[in-house]
Amino acid sequence: MDHIQLLNDKIDINLIHQLLIDQSCGACSVFLGTTRDNFEGKNVISLEYEAYENMALKEMGKICTDLRVRWPSLKHIVIYHRLGIVPVSEVSVVIAASAPHRVAALESVNFAIDQLKSRVPIWKKEVYEKDLIGEWKANVECPWPQYSKTSLRTFEFFSCKIDQKTENIPDKLVQIRVDDSELNRRVKCFLKRKRDEINLYNIHDFKQLSTNTELADSSESEVKYSCARTQSSLVKQQQSKSHLKVRREIDNSGPHVRPNYSSQLNKLTTAQHYKNDSFENSMLRNSRLRNIEEYMCVTSDGDNILNRIKNIENKILLLESISPEYKYFVSIFIIVYQMFILSNS
């Protein structure tokens, strides 16, 4: 028989023993999880447990089912977990099993402990002697990456040393002209917006789907108490290796929405091709263009000067659409472009 329960009071060990005893069983394995008084040099005074009780009980029942599939000889299974404040040295969780032989009892309890930590929605907070607010702790058995405080810190510039120092940078080469506080505000707003978008998409992408008639005919309570942590269903999208939907985005902002953008772009990107071997073979002019390509991170397109200039133009248009501040840099490029056209004519 399976005995699962969430308690707000102390767990009675004698009751657990009575639930396990059976005349056909020769082994009882019991695990008791207690509150220790220290963690990484801090004095712990208590643990506080919270749970999504409906889902927790369902997952505990599924664990019992998995145990009986793996070890059919199990007679009784007990999973008790205490909620609320648990002082030091008191029992917070009990996992026990009885079987005719000790191997099944010992192995099943060990397996159940790991499954309880990784699957059941129960959260633990450690309350310290000098920090009564406490700190929520994640189980190492959880499949997702562990939370790290360093992930929320600002970028540490000292970790990336720059040997070359540039002084007296012209203002026209600076794309974003704001102070550090404004820049940090923009970054935080961007991260917050992306986090909200991800949370919104997760609501649609990670949800319980009715895969059979039993789920379809189930009561509303079954759908109400669904949890993405344990009942997520990913549906692979067509022509994609992921569950994410691929959408075509329409950009309604940028230089391409300006009046006469196409004609202006054609003027910049089209030019008459003059066959001039002396120009193509000129090391001086070629080196000047190569320097611009290296600065703009553009791949050189052979010896065709016009195609190389067109690639640089496309890169500048891309940067201008990404960052509005980059439009101040366009005037410099136009001057360089006109110099090459005049030298080619």
From Swiss-Prot:
Q: Which GO terms describe its biological process?
A: chromatin remodeling; Mo-molybdopterin cofactor biosynthetic process
Q: What is its EC number?
A: 2.8.1.12
One Pfam family, short name please? MoaE
Q: Does the record bear Transferase in its keywords?
A: yes
The alphabetical list of record keywords is: Cytoplasm, Molybdenum cofactor biosynthesis, Transferase
Question: What does the function comment of this entry state?
Answer: Catalytic subunit of the molybdopterin synthase complex, a complex that catalyzes the conversion of precursor Z into molybdopterin. Acts by mediating the incorporation of 2 sulfur atoms from thiocarboxylated Mocs2A into precursor Z to generate a dithiolene group.
Further details from the record = This protein is produced by a bicistronic gene which also produces the small subunit (Mocs2A).
Q: How does it assemble?
A: Heterotetramer; composed of 2 small (Mocs2A) and 2 large (Mocs2B) subunits.
Q: What class of enzyme is it?
A: transferase
Catalytic activity line of the entry? 2 [molybdopterin-synthase sulfur-carrier protein]-C-terminal-Gly-aminoethanethioate + cyclic pyranopterin phosphate + H2O = molybdopterin + 2 [molybdopterin-synthase sulfur-carrier protein]-C-terminal Gly-Gly + 2 H(+)
**UniProt KW Transferase keyword:** yes
**Coiled coil location:** none
Which superkingdom heads the taxonomic lineage of this protein's source? Eukaryota
Pathway involvement of the protein, from the record: Cofactor biosynthesis; molybdopterin biosynthesis
InterPro entries for this protein: MoaE_sf, MOCS2B_euk, Mopterin_biosynth_MoaE
Query: Which GO terms of the molecular function aspect are on file?
Result: molybdopterin synthase activity
Q: Which family does it belong to?
A: Belongs to the MoaE family. MOCS2B subfamily.
Query: Where, subcellularly, is it found?
Result: Cytoplasm
Q: Which gene encodes it?
A: Mocs2B
Protein name per UniProt: Molybdopterin synthase catalytic subunit
Q: Where does substrate bind?
A: 101-102, 117, 124-126
- What GO CC terms are in its UniProt record? ATAC complex; cytosol; molybdopterin synthase complex; polytene chromosome
